């Protein structure tokens, strides 16, 4: 380090006006007086050592600047003076002093820087979310320098209305109770657990932690309660199941009785139908017998009428009856035995008449007739009576 003694003193004794000045505090909305920057004991010791060395007229040795810086600079405060251009905090840049050489400055801790950045983000989100109130918890490291923001300027609530003010006044800040930050350590017991613990003869404290024996007893009691509840649930489900079965049995029995009544009615109806069927069968049998009798009677009547009426319509009656004049006897072979004497006389007269009527060339016919008579064994008598036996066939 090539810093001169006056420049080094000016750099380390100069208060951080850019961050914690009155204007900057009012700009952030912290209505509190600017903090005074006291000189710590380490700084006083360092200055005294430096002054004593300066009185002797000797400068800093090679290892003395590092020791001197370690007395004044905390690693949590050192950061680069050149802030990023996209930061929203607005406190990362400091007006440069052309006369003074660049020297490290003590600024806010990283946690404080993060809180200021979140305030700027909340200001940007105001138009989207509306006027709501959020919580900000400012936490610092174990090493907190005296020139940081005092306790009166720390806030716990931050409204989103950042146009009017970012942080509320010191009088409106509500401190957060410690009970909300710590977990509840109270032991809560139900009436059933208390009753079982009383039966066991064990009294548990109302605050945690418990001893191992007390934890075992409490687990045992809670296990008993769970077993009891599970048994009650199983009995309840079993009872509901049995009740459902009983209701189903009652419904089935009622339906069975109704079906039995319907079956009895159907049986009676079936019996009546069977009786009607038998009656119909008997009626059909009687009507069939009567129909057969009537049909036979009608057939007999028609046959008799046919026998009576058909002879009158015989084809023989349509021919005219042949007279005695038109009748011409012909020789017919007959097998009948004729013994009557009138038959022979008639035959003779017929033969004579035929001879008279026939021409002379008809001898053969007469001869045949005579031969026929001779064959018949008849002999002519002078009286004209011939007795003979003729055999003729009936046609």
Curated annotation (Swiss-Prot):
Domain bZIP: 217-280
Gene Ontology CC: chromatin; endoplasmic reticulum; endoplasmic reticulum membrane; Golgi apparatus; Golgi membrane; mitochondrion; nuclear membrane; nucleoplasm
Pfam families reported in the protein's UniProt record: bZIP_1
CDD domains tied to this protein: bZIP_CREB3
Residues carrying covalently attached carbohydrate according to the record: 366
Factors inducing expression: By androgens.
Annotated positions for site Cleavage: 338-339
Residue ranges, annotated region (Basic motif): 219-248
Transmembrane segments: 296-316
Molecular functions per Gene Ontology: DNA-binding transcription activator activity, RNA polymerase II-specific; DNA-binding transcription factor activity, RNA polymerase II-specific; RNA polymerase II cis-regulatory region sequence-specific DNA binding; sequence-specific double-stranded DNA binding
Topological type in the membrane: Single-pass type II membrane protein
Described purpose of this protein according to its UniProt entry: Transcriptional activator that may play a role in the unfolded protein response. Binds to the UPR element (UPRE) but not to CRE element. Preferentially binds DNA with to the consensus sequence 5'-T[GT]ACGT[GA][GT]-3' and has transcriptional activation activity from UPRE. Binds to NF-kappa-B site and has transcriptional activation activity from NF-kappa-B-containing regulatory elements.
Family: Belongs to the bZIP family. ATF subfamily.
Protein name, per record: Cyclic AMP-responsive element-binding protein 3-like protein 4
Native source organism of the sequence: Homo sapiens
């Amino acid at each position: 380090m090539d810093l001169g003694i006056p420049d080094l003193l000016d750099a380390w004794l100069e208060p951080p006006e850019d961050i914690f000045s009155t204007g900057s505090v009012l700009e952030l909305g912290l209505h509190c007086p600017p903090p005074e920057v006291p000189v710590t004991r380490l700084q006083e010791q360092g200055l005294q050592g430096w002054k004593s060395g300066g009185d002797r007229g000797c400068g800093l040795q090679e290892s003395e600047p590092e020791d001197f810086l370690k007395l004044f600079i905390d690693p949590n405060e050192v950061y680069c003076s050149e802030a990023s251009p996209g930061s929203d905090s607005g406190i990362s840049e400091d007006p440069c002093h052309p006369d003074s050489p660049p020297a490290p400055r003590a600024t806010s801790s990283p946690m404080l820087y993060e809180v200021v950045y979140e305030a700027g983000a909340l200001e940007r989100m105001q138009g989207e979310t509306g006027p709501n109130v959020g919580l900000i918890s400012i936490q610092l490291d174990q090493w907190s320098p005296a020139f940081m923001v005092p306790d009166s300027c720390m806030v716990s609530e931050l409204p989103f209305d950042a146009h009017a003010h970012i942080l509320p006044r010191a009088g409106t800040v509500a401190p957060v109770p410690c009970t909300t930050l710590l977990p509840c350590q109270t032991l809560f017991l139900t009436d059933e657990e208390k009753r079982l613990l009383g039966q066991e003869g064990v009294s548990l404290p109302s605050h945690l932690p418990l001893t191992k024996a007390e934890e075992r007893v409490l687990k045992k009691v809670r296990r008993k309660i769970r077993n009891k509840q599970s048994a009650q649930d199983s009995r309840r489900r079993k009872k509901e199941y049995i009740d459902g079965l009983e209701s189903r049995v009652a419904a089935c029995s009622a339906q069975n009785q109704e079906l039995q009544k319907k079956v009895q009615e159907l049986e009676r109806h079936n019996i009546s139908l069977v009786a009607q069927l038998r009656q119909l069968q008997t009626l059909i049998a009687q009507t069939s017998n009567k129909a057969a009798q009537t049909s036979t009677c009608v057939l007999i009547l028609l046959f008799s009428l046919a026998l009576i009426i058909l002879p009158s319509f015989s084809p023989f009656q349509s021919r005219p009856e042949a007279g005695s004049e038109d009748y011409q006897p012909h020789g017919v072979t007959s097998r009948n035995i004729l013994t009557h004497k009138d038959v022979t006389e008639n035959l003779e007269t017929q033969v004579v008449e035929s001879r008279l009527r026939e021409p002379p060339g008809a001898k053969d016919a007469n001869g045949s007739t005579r031969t026929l008579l001779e064959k018949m064994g008849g002999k002519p008598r002078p009286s004209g009576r011939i007795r003979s036996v003729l055999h003729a066939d009936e046609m």
